[in-house]
Amino acid sequence: MAAGRVWGRLGAVSGALAVTAGAYGAHGFRRSDRDEYLKELFETGNRYHFLHSLALLAVPHCRRPLLAGSLLTSGIVLFSGTFYYQALSGDPTLTKAAPYGGTLLILGWAAMAL
């Protein structure tokens, strides 16, 4: 399998996971007794997860797919993963990783422009 195709497939799997998480957020998590802040965190993490999964689908068309794909994937894990974790557990200890994840997402978009 060509290296570029891996990123397209990863984007598709990530998108499927984002839709699954969104369904849980809309039907399970939102109906729970969690406070509004945690619900907003979950929604934000899910929104960024989904949008950047779509970006991964374009990575095979970049000049540097390994760089762009690695940055976007790492950014999704650190940014959205941190928000998902805090929203589900209530534990804010990993929150400090979110800005690093956001920075990786920005760099991933920039790498797509190279």
UniProtKB/Swiss-Prot annotation:
GO CC annotation, single: plasma membrane
Q: Which domain of life is it from?
A: Eukaryota
Q: Give TM segment ranges.
A: 65-85, 94-114
| Pfam families reported in the protein's UniProt record | DUF423
User: Which compartment or compartments is the protein found in?
Assistant: Cell membrane
Query: What does the record list as coiled-coil region(s)?
Result: none
Please give, as recorded in its UniProt entry, the membrane topology of this protein: Multi-pass membrane protein
What is the annotated signal peptide range for this record?
A: 1-25
Sorted UniProt keywords = Cell membrane, Membrane, Signal, Transmembrane, Transmembrane helix
Has keyword Mitochondrion?
Answer: no
Q: Which residues lie on this side of the membrane: Extracellular?
A: 26-64
Cytoplasmic compartment segments: 86-93
Similarity field: Belongs to the TMEM256 family.
Q: What is this protein called?
A: Transmembrane protein 256 homolog
Species for this entry: Bufo gargarizans
